[in-house]
Design a protein with these regions (language model features):
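Hydrophobic-ligand-binding modules of eukaryotic lipid transfer/binding families
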Residues: 2-16, 68, 101-103, 125-131, ...
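Hydrophobic ligand-binding cavity/cleft-lining segments
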Residues: 2-52
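A broad, low-specificity signal marking well-ordered, structured residues that form hydrophobic/aromatic
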Residues: 10, 80, 92
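Generic structural detector for well-ordered beta-strands
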Residues: 18-22, 59, 72, 93
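Glycine-rich portal/gate segments that line the openings of hydrophobic small-molecule binding cavities
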Residues: 39-89, 101, 132, 140-144
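Beta-strand/loop substructures that line and gate deep hydrophobic ligand-binding cavities in soluble
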Residues: 83-145
Length: 145
């Protein structure tokens, strides 16, 4: 999606991945909402660490990203939201599924003139990263949550 604002073109790209996990939604949410556990399931090259109440620091050396952002954990919705305004935002939603299973939806939005907003390899890398993150999350949840 491309929009015009203030005389320049502002691009936007959104990515989403979904995965069924053989664990309850509460068990999955316990892992994703524990910000100290982010390194266990977020794949390289992304390194995100909590720095304070509602704050995180992200380091993505491949992209030259070294930035602070915000994070909001919403237990009543089984949802975690984060952002580095105005270029980036994301959320993870855990939903109940049949039996002792859950579904996890991971969404990322890139705004502005970032490589991901132009498609090609950077966009494919984001899609792969989403799939890898959900696969790692499943391993963490099912082996040692």
């Amino acid at each position: 999606m491309v929009g015009r604002k203030g005389g320049y073109i502002r691009a936007m790209a959104e990515f989403e991945a979904e995965r069924g996990i053989p664990a309850t939604a509460e068990r999955v949410f316990a892992v994703v909402s524990d910000l100290d556990r982010l390194p266990e399931w977020l794949p390289a090259p992304v390194d995100v660490r909590p720095t304070g109440e509602g704050e995180v620091h992200a380091d993505v050396p491949e992209r030259g990203v070294d930035a602070d952002g915000t994070v909001r954990v919403r237990p009543e919705q089984l949802r975690v939201e984060w952002a580095h305004a105005p270029e980036y935002a994301g959320w993870l939603q855990v939903e109940h599924a049949e039996g002792a299973r859950s579904t996890v939806l991971l969404h990322l939005s890139f705004l502005g003139d970032q490589p991901e907003t132009h498609g090609g390899t950077p966009a494919a890398d984001v899609r792969q990263w989403l799939d890898d993150a959900l696969a790692r999350l499943e391993r963490v949840v099912t082996t040692n949550a």
